Structure formats: C-alpha cells, structure tokens
C-alpha cells in the first residue's frame, strides 16, 4: 500500500486470530460487527503500528490527498470545524490546530489526534464500547495527552 499499512484490512478473516475481543457495557465479549457496504465507516481493522504510519504520513505536506482530507469544509463554531472525516480543533490557529477522528463499534472505541504543525500524534485503540462505564476514561486520556503535547 502507499503508506505500507500492511496490517490494516476490511477482511476480518485475514486478522481474526489477532483481534482483541470487544467488550460491551457489562464487560462481556461481543461479536465483531459485519458492516458490509458500510465498511469504510467503521469496518477498518488495524493496529497501533499501522495507525502510526498513517499519522506520520499526515506530516508529509506534499501528499495532496491527505492534505485535502484536512481542509476545512464546514464550520461548527469558532473553535471547531470539519474536514473530510476530521474534526478540526482551532482551525484558525496554525499553532494550536489539531485534527481528530474517533470511532465506535460494538465492543471497540478508537481515537486518532494529529498535530501536523508540531508533528505529534495520539492513537487510542480500545476494546471498550462507548456504553461501557470505563469509556469516559478514554476521553479523559485523550484530553490529558492533548494537553501534554500542546505544552
């Protein structure tokens, strides 16, 4: 692949033995969702190594495709905008601008945050569903990590 993300796929059967079991709100294992035609909206199976490669690719300002994804297409408010799949925090500030995308499926949650200007990134991959009582810890961890990379 263009970014050498050899551990990422839509085909569960290719990585089934490597998957961490997803957990519901009671902490019980749940089956993976089969999203079929909606696969690109939540069916990517990946790992921290490949997500790191994806973050590093964001730092290449010559990559027109990735740069296009980060262009603001709509404004939510003064401190938040939207790109193609990215929430853009502080879109008017080159110094504090960050790009964020999170996801949830049955038994899993994830967050990726990219600071292109300072070449920093955060990846959080969890087998905790958004309805799990521990899910809020993921948001707290993300907020704490953002604060640390900004300082």
Residue ranges: model-predicted function:
Residues 4-11, 17, 24-151:
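Catalytic loop of the DD-peptidase/beta-lactamase superfamily, centered on the K-T-G motif
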